[in-house]
Amino acid sequence: MLEWLPARVPGHVHLDLVEQGVIADPFERMNELGCQWVDDQEVSYRTQFEFSPDSAAPHRALRFEGLDTVCQVFLNGEQIAAHENMFAPLELDVSERLVSGLNRLEVRFDSAVRVGKAIRARYFAEQGLPETTARFDERSFVRKAQYMYGWDWGPRLVSAGIWRPVSLIEYAARIRDVHVTQSHAPNGAVRLDAHSDADAGVLVHVFSDAGVCVGDGQVADLPKPERWYPHGLGPQTLHTLTSYLCPLDFDAASLPVDRSAAEARLAAVALDRRTTRVGIRTVRLLQKEDSFGRSFEFEVNGESLFALGANWIPGHSFPSRISRRALRERLESAREVGMNMLRVWGGGLYESDDFYELCDELGLLVWQDFPFACAYYPDTGEFGAAVREEACVNVRRLRNHPSLALWCGNNENEVMFQQSWGGEEHRPPRYYGEHLYDQVLPQVLLELDPERPYVPSSPHGGEKDGNSGGVGDQHYWDVWHGRGDWQHYRDSSARFSSEYGFASSCSMRAWRSVFAEHARDALPGASVTLHDLRASVRDPIVRWHDKTAKGYEVFLSYAALHYPEPQTLEDWVYYSQLNQRDALRCALEHYRRSAFCKGSLIWQLNDCWPVQSWALIDSEGQPKSAWFELRRLHAPELMSITLAAAHAELHLGLDNARSDWRGNVSLSAVSLLTGSEVRSLNAEFSVANGERRNVLRLPLEGLNQRSTLLVANCGSSSAYALLAEPKELELASAEPLSVSFDTDGVLELRNTTPLIDLVLTDARGTVAFLDNCVTLPRPGVTRLRYRGQGHGLEARSLAGRHPLRALATRLI
């Protein structure tokens, strides 16, 4: 039995044990295995605090914002509560339990693994379910973030801890909730109404930056309000409402007319105050029968939206570690490449207030799954009641956010039952959990958030096959979990592709963290030294940090279809990330050429630990090659080139735009050896918002496919296509490159030969690139944006590694 050790709150026990040297860092090497004994342990946290009953406030509450997960709370040696839900706060009235002076607080956590197994055994006996029933293990019976039990991109670290803040609240009366509703008139006027849940015997006075109301109820009539839009469609205008809770004997009629003076008067007498930010907007989910099936299309403020974004997983294996700063960095990275929507995946969390506030500010719509994923769940009795309570708490917390666009019952549970995942013989006799998604959650939303769209599962389409593509949304995994070659993305018939992805290696910086580069000796059992890190891609540690369940040789073979065989870990990082980029480019261009697809949400934006995965940005914050390509793929104006046996076609498409796209476009064949133009066509064009057009057809006869690049240009828009596989190309040798850094965060680079997929890396970790992984079809000077100190750079393209010559003067 361990003695008492120092602990951090908020925190998780694994983090404390690492800090105290009891276990090794589970993110390094293969240490995950050696840490899993902690999952089966009971853990206690204790502290003591001074309390002086000097306050005039008659009520005192102890509030835990997050407890992970099954625990009992003791105050001064007496159990005062039990809790079993990571997603719901716990608030306890301790007005009569606190003592003057020193108070002792203890929280005792049971093992979520052992509790889940025990409940499962009882439930299976009651239901008469065989032990071999698939997708119904211990995680289904504990309301805890499901990814912590391990996923195909994350470790199994079923931790415990006080994962969100704890506070002692003293009050006379409180505003518990403010719900702001919007009524939109046909002429564009909007009425805001604030409905407050507050203690009896008080009055609520609400101020907004658009108007004033004395008393609870109507806030403001706005004849021409500034609306909130997702990124790319308009501004993210937010209005702040401030609610004041005042005694019943307060004379509201005496409030000054001047707003500042009135608020100062209220602040002096208020028993409580709460601020709420709202954005004026409408969001609808259109699902209409048509000749293709049934649509799945978001409409914001009456305008059709092509949703462009990604799936979001928790940003750390131990969610107590996720900071507002880290959230901002990831979310700004999403906006930087033109995303307008994120899907908060059902195996994770209801995210923190910080997350939704940042999405409001950045214009990122949120598709919010309720936290159920890839499993069956009990759906009646105590479990159903707990889910209802959890949902009520979180719907109230999140419903005022303009970024919140959709509630979804679960991730893939419906299609899991339809397709008998785990085998027909191991499928349960009914869809366990269905009552939650069809009854419990819709009823909560009807009561608390009736205006926001809801779907019971994702994907959700046809009655027999919810993942058919022609109806509803689709998770298109036929490539990664099926045919392997990314060219098959062109077979998807999705109306809305809410999950699809292609995995790749994390960055060398992430690998350095895995191999614990700070140590001095070679790693036991690893074929690398810490100072060189030229690891074999088949090294056991490298393989351990691949949870894709694909079989590592298959993973390698997917890249080998197109790229040379990697000889070093650095080769694998480079080639696998290019292959991921190619895959997502193929898919996104296909979806945006489609006449009926209205959304693309890539799996996945982020990682929770250093791993090879589908992420666009790894755990070290390093964008992969695909991330840089997304700026082009998510732009309103998109060019794409498709190849047939005898010709290439140039396609144009326009989405999320307020005006037509007009101009002159060219499609050229360029020599990869010299950069000279071999053949070219051009045309005038005009494309309306939502329109797709084929504008040019270039003959390919007589071209050397191994040494030709197709280049399309129109203003700032461009597209490239190779006629041969990258591993078959004839390229100019890797010549030195001249680079210069200016004070505005711009790197100028001069190339003397064409370069395909030039990637700059920073061995010192001092540079963050905003532009990278570029193709330069002709010799010249290119400007790339960066942040940080421009030193210690390395460069490689498909031709090989390029020496860099740093110049003190600008190149242009």
Language-model regions: role of each:
Residues 219-226, 670-705, 766-790:
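Intrinsically disordered, low-complexity Pro/Gly/Ser/Thr-rich segments with frequent PxxP/GP/PP motifs
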Residues 1-63, 136-165, 169-172, 253-260, ...:
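Extended carbohydrate-recognition surfaces in non-catalytic/accessory domains of CAZymes
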Residues 248-261, 272, 699-735, 789-812:
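Terminal connector regions
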Residues 60, 73-75, 188-216, 648-686, ...:
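Beta-strand-rich binding/interaction modules
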Residues 12, 35, 40-172, 199, ...:
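Accessory beta-strand-rich segments of carbohydrate-active enzymes
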Residues 23-51, 58-63, 68-75, 81-84, ...:
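Active-site-adjacent substrate/metal-binding segments within catalytic domains
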Residues 8, 147, 158-161, 173, ...:
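Substrate-binding clefts and catalytic carboxylate motifs of secreted carbohydrate-active enzymes
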Residues 343-361, 366-541, 579, 597, ...:
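Substrate-binding/catalytic cleft of secreted carbohydrate-active enzymes
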